[in-house]
């Protein structure tokens, strides 16, 4: 399984100034539960915003720079990350360039919708989801955060595939 996961504002924003501009502990717990034991693929800016490897998961950072930290593996591309991950479950966790490149590989896209309107000079927008390629599931309430909604988009498969 290869999945993309992110939270998005009503304006389609996923980040401001290299950071996630909201904090919902229940959504962080859900993220941890879903991604635990899998391989995470992220860009360098996303890694720097987190500040450390996420425990219980393999952390692959797509970067042209070497990051010398225990628990981090540097790769040059999404394709190299997927080759390193092998048959493991993979979650693409940001940023925008990683999401765009991951679209051609993803089996599903797990989106949390936050009600927060945000602004800033350095905004990052969510990737466009092609509903010709991804079937939208139902809009569901978040299990732990009443203000949030979530939806999983599943890749449409060709007939006979």
Residue ranges and their predicted role:
Residues 1-161:
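Enzymes that bind and transform nitrogen-containing heteroaromatic metabolites
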